[in-house]
A protein has these predicted regions:
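A cross-family phosphate/adenosyl-ligand binding-site feature
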Residues: 3-6, 14, 19-212
């Protein structure tokens, strides 16, 4: 079940110090995944389970994404045990600067609401996930978007039951528009998301982890 992404951008509250390529610890350039969570519950648990298997992942939460996590009883404190979590808190897009610092090699938006898909497809970057996606593309950083509304009939899990949705033509058109965006791969299921991530890992000469970063 999707919830709209807020129309006012915010950005940032981070649970730990952000890495930079010049840190004393020697953080390699473009060494991490940036995983953005929007206000969608569509295969949310499955998406997070895949993120947990990747090496070196930071979670970027929109305000709506943070609300939906709680609705689905996925608590921030639990996520912080396995990820660095960056939250939507100010209007200046501070976390996006980590893309300019060459911290991230891949931006994942999963799951992505139809609202976020529309923003990304039309070049609107007024939320943390849509801003991350836009700036990644400008830097030539590959993006993977797990779009929710990709078929005429979509069965999705709400917090209490399974729901059948029928995306409108405009939602389906926006997905196709998004597919044409540079440096963007659109996926439509957890299996496709896993396959896209596996291919990206292979490109980077990396492997799945058995635990989160």
């Amino acid at each position: 079940m999707s919830a709209a992404t807020p129309s006012t951008a915010s950005s940032t509250s981070c649970t730990s110090k952000s890495p930079t390529p010049t840190e004393a610890g020697g953080t390699p350039l473009r060494s991490r995944f940036a995983w953005c969570i929007t206000g969608s519950g569509h295969f949310l648990e499955e998406s997070i389970a895949l993120a947990e298997r990747l090496p070196d992942v930071d979670l970027f939460l929109s305000a709506a994404g943070e609300e939906v996590l709680e609705i689905y009883k996925i608590h921030l404190d639990d996520l912080k045990a396995g990820f660095r979590v960056i939250r939507d808190k100010t209007a200046s897009g501070v976390p996006v600067g980590m893309l300019y610092d060459d911290v991230y090699h891949t931006v994942v938006v999963a799951p992505a609401t139809s609202n976020t898909v529309a923003k990304c497809a039309f070049g609107i970057s007024d939320s943390l996930p849509s801003n991350m996606f836009a700036q990644a593309g400008k830097l030539g950083i590959p993006g993977i978007v797990f779009a929710c509304d990709t078929e005429p009939v979509v069965v999705t899990k709400s917090p209490h039951d399974w729901v059948t949705l029928r995306p409108r033509g405009i939602e389906l058109q926006n997905v196709e528009r998004l597919r044409a965006i540079d440096f963007c791969q659109v996926v439509a299921s957890p299996a496709e998301l896993e396959a896209a991530l596996a291919a990206r890992l292979a490109d980077l000469s990396l492997a799945w982890n058995t635990s989160s970063s």
